[in-house]
């Protein structure tokens, strides 16, 4: 991005944050958040969720952070909670999809946003 492009994006984000969302956008946002949270919880019982949780606990340890891992009783450092949550959310591919972009934004964005939101007082 050029500086001009960065400034345009920054200005748009600053203005968007202050504006109310249209109700249909707010409803779609709620549905995507709930869908991703459900995928994070159900994914904890699947191989990818179990392995991610085991991996982060092998060096981070439980109870050493300020971010929860949905679907478990664990509290982890935010980066580890986001990683393990993202792995679980995508474990059985029930997470959301952006058809035009052919990607799953929720499994990366929602766990990270939740971890940061819990970490920041």
Q: Each predicted region: which residue ranges?
A:
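N-terminal core-entry segment
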Residues: 1-121
């Amino acid at each position: 991005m050029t500086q001009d492009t960065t400034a345009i994006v920054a200005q748009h984000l600053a203005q968007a944050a202050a504006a109310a969302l249209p109700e249909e956008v707010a409803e779609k946002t709620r549905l995507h958040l709930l869908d991703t949270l459900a995928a994070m919880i159900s994914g904890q019982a699947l191989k990818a969720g179990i392995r991610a949780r085991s991996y982060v606990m092998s060096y981070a340890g439980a109870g050493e952070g300020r971010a929860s891992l949905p679907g478990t009783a664990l509290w982890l450092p935010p980066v580890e909670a986001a990683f393990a949550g993202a792995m679980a959310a995508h474990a059985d591919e029930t997470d959301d999809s952006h058809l035009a972009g052919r990607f799953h934004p929720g499994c990366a964005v929602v766990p990270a946003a939740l971890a940061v939101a819990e970490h920041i007082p």
